[in-house]
C-alpha cells in the first residue's frame, strides 16, 4: 500500500533525527512546515530546552504577509530566528529539515538564516 505524504515525512524525519543531535555548543535548528505556516526553533537536545524560536505567527511577522505559506514568509522567519540566535550568542547550528525535502519554503528559510549569520 502506498504511503501518504505525511507518513513519508515522518519516516524521513525519524531517519534524520537518528543522525542529527543538538548540543550546547552546536544546537539544532529544527523546522516544521504546515500548510499555512512555518516554524523554526533552535534546540539544545542535551538539556531538552528550546533556546530560540520564530514562526509566521510571531507578533513581529503576523501582519506582514497575506499567507504564512510563502517563500517570502519563510525567508522572514529564517532572518528572525537567526537574529534571535545571534543575540543569544549562538552562531553555529545543525540544520534539521524535519523530514521535508530541501526545496521551496525549507530552502528559503535555510538560505535566509545563513545570510543573516548562522553557520550550518
From Swiss-Prot:
Keywords, sorted A to Z: Ribonucleoprotein, Ribosomal protein, RNA-binding, rRNA-binding
Pfam families: Ribosomal_L18p
Gene Ontology CC terms: cytosolic large ribosomal subunit
Region (Disordered): 1-24
SUPFAM superfamilies: Translational machinery components (SSF53137)
Superkingdom of origin organism: Bacteria
UniProt keyword annotation of Ribonucleoprotein present: yes
Composition bias type Basic and acidic residues, residue spans: 1-10
Signal peptide: none
Alphabetical list of InterPro entries matching this protein: Ribosomal_uL18_bac-type, Ribosomal_uL18_bac/euk
NCBIfam families: L18_bact
Family of this protein: Belongs to the universal ribosomal protein uL18 family.
Protein's recorded name: Large ribosomal subunit protein uL18
Amino acid at each position: 500500500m502506498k504511503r501518504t505524504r505525511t507518513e513519508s515525512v515522518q519516516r524521513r524525519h525519524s531517519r534524520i533525527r537518528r543522525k542529527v543531535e543538538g548540543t550546547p555548543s552546536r544546537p539544532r535548528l529544527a523546522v516544521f512546515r504546515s500548510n499555512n505556516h512555518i516554524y523554526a526553533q533552535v534546540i539544545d537536545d542535551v538539556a531538552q530546552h528550546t533556546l530560540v524560536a520564530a514562526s509566521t505567527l510571531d507578533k513581529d511577522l503576523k501582519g506582514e504577509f497575506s499567507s504564512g505559506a510563502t517563500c517570502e514568509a519563510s525567508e522572514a522567519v529564517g532572518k528572525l530566528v537567526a537574529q534571535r540566535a545571534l543575540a543569544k550568542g549562538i552562531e553555529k547550528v545543525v540544520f534539521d529539515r524535519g523530514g521535508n525535502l530541501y526545496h521551496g519554503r525549507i530552502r528559503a528559510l535555510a538560505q535566509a538564516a545563513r545570510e543573516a549569520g548562522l553557520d550550518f
